[in-house]
């Protein structure tokens, strides 16, 4: 899941980013739904009186450090949009709130799926009595969540018009998925009414998903909001563009208001049945034990309203928390000294106010990508590879961590975060910071300096390296660090500013030369390494990297169990990334999150988004 690099820095991410367990969620569709699954036909349907215990007077105020793009779960791929859709839709499975290592558990499913002996067919039973938010598309009837809704959602990913960022995952994993998509491309229309061989309904509450081969990571895909059950009649009512602003699900919250790039307000879904807080904390963890003791036995959710502000500047974010305008904050790096002592303990001024701290190494990776299709830095010829490698060697990551991250990060040696399954603590990158070596490499490949000390291309044309970044103060700091680094090796730097959603769009079109991003919420190495898989160009492969050897190793990685052979394949992938100069790795964040005293049970799970159902807040 793509996250703006400056955002990862501003708030050390408003939610977690990647981790050593599992990651993702998918599912949904088939057949004409119409109103066939509605129950009582009242002009104004009466929600279940025993449903959602949330108190409308309990208002949680939070902030995102970057703008959202929209709320169609099949089409969005940024952290903040997904955080909202995760609170609106229900996938079949999710993660246990406190289990470490992480454990997948049923959500909208009645139980964990039945898996065939050959490991290729997953059969799910949907819980009875789950209902969508009341909506005019249901024509006055209560609309129950059924198996067909999950089939429909999955098939929406196969529909080419939706341009799903997850399509490569499903192509690889689900039987017949790629063929259905290719058929739709050829015909110009996806047939949602034809029975799909790999995703199909067995009865009203039962669906089956057939895989191409046994897959260790398939269930983790289904934990994501993009696999939550969607009602076909809602999708068809709104159409392609309007659906982004009108998500309808069976999850705990409803989108009440959206002012693009400014404000998002959610209110409790009256149809959501709720649950009792009953989770087992990790042993010997005082913070988690305290939270469990505080929350055990409460009827959840309790938060009846969530108000999200978009605050892109770190200073404004910090002032909002200090002034109790927001209830929780991931401390921006530039304000870490105002929150923590030199030993990383909470400052006494905050302790005296009853503020709680939750601190963790994040499941994320931050990197600078280099577009292989860019006319200046792209390409696979020796001189272009030398240029990218020199740029990477010329950038001082240690200084970035010290100056911009304020020491709250771990230098990345590989693409997989230390807290993600597949990380190898013994692996060390070949790439080292060395302006001397970078200059020598550029000299060797014909990038000559002019009288002012700036280099030209080997053909004599001016060399100008262009990076994209946001308008935030943190990105301005980073721009200065890039300028300093490039001046050391004689490369002119041009910085282009734009908004995060627009840069995501351009990145998918291979139109950005270079940009700093973060990748988050991957549960396993496979989901990180696909960032350079050629089949994800136009989705998550912003470097637009195509390499047959990389692809072959990635295909092998997906099939291998844990062990020395799989580790060797991961090493091959890392080396191919380094040798070709595709990514300049930066760091994994150490996040410090603070919550005011009135917030009870606050913590962060590495993989769960839209997690407001798990904690409580005192009324004003």
Residue ranges and their predicted role:
Residues 44-45, 52, 79-80, 213-216, ...:
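Detector for C-terminal structural segments
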Residues 57-66, 120-125, 150-153, 207-209, ...:
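Short, well-ordered beta-strand elements
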Residues 97-99, 178-206, 210-307, 315-316, ...:
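Gly/Pro-rich hinge or "lid" segments in bacterial periplasmic/extracellular proteins
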Residues 66-83, 105-108, 136-139, 165, ...:
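A structural "hinge/loop" feature
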Residues 110-170, 208, 317-320, 381-383, ...:
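Aromatic- and charge-enriched surface segment that lines or borders ligand/interaction sites
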Residues 248, 308-316, 334, 495-505:
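Short helix-initiation/N-cap motifs at beta->coil->alpha
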Residues 45-47, 63-117, 155, 248, ...:
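N-terminal lobe/hinge region of extracytoplasmic solute-binding protein
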Residues 167, 256-267, 294-296, 307-374, ...:
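Extracellular/periplasmic solute-recognition and catalytic clefts
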